[in-house]
Amino acid sequence: MSSVVISGNTSGTVTIAAPAVAGSGTQTLQAGSGTVALDNTFGFKNRLINGCFRVDQRNNGASQTITAAAALAYTVDRWYAYCTGANVTGQRVAGTGSNQYNYQFTGAASVTGINFAQRIETLNSYDLNGQNVTLSVYMSNSLLTSVTWTAYYANTSDTFGSVASPTVTQIATGTFTVSSTYSQYTANIAIPAAATTGIQIVFSVGAQTSGTWVIGYPQLELGTTATSFDIRDHTRELSMCQRYYISAPNGTMVFPVNAQYQSAQFPVVMRTTPTMTITPGSGSISGTTITTMGFYAACSLGPTAALYLASAEL
């Protein structure tokens, strides 16, 4: 029996053996070459959550006004926007090709800037420190030809500050030259060893005084090559989003009688103890106790159903 032995560059071997049989056979191998990005073959490839924009708990596809010079406004889950000069409209819209959804900003007179960004918590980005990563995104813009990307890390763990008073350190920045044709753009980023406290990725444009800016499939991954977009199943993507924000519809919680305490468990453990709004069909809420796993409260009038919002955003 003959064999071929392939040695690894560290230890161990792979042996390909042919059985001891009479006669001979021929196996023709097709010519070709290619590469495999082993960094991202398994696991949590895209560190940007909801890059597919499928989860939109706040607006469910409806348009949203982003108020100029205001605090950041969350849009589709995990993504926030802010603008300067004048208000703009943001909305999840139909995608292009196999991409189900894109996110679109519509410009307005006097707009001087629009920003679209995500903050990645320490637990999901710590291992990127000292590594090379690739940022990729699809974009088009019917008015402007330049989109700036910027990467930051938080100065203290999971604390990024506000739009007016950021507490971050810039890692790198660059510019994509875009057009009205929906195309992919990529950038390589060297993450410093100090970036162990959370990462922020920001896309920005200038005076979008008209027209539209369309964004799709943003991805941040280990390695120096942009690979295919990481499509996660919807249940997992929703759960990842609910770690930061939950919109529970009316009837999720029921208060059967007056002033009786009722408890509710969150669908996932939240990032930190959330701020909450509980809205009953009648009466008022009191005695609320909240943890990362759920809450309990009483309602002055029952029976009544209630809805709630819980936010643990960065």
Give residue ranges: language-model regions.
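Beta-strand-rich, repetitive solenoid scaffolds
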Residues: 4-9, 14-20, 26-32, 36-40, ...
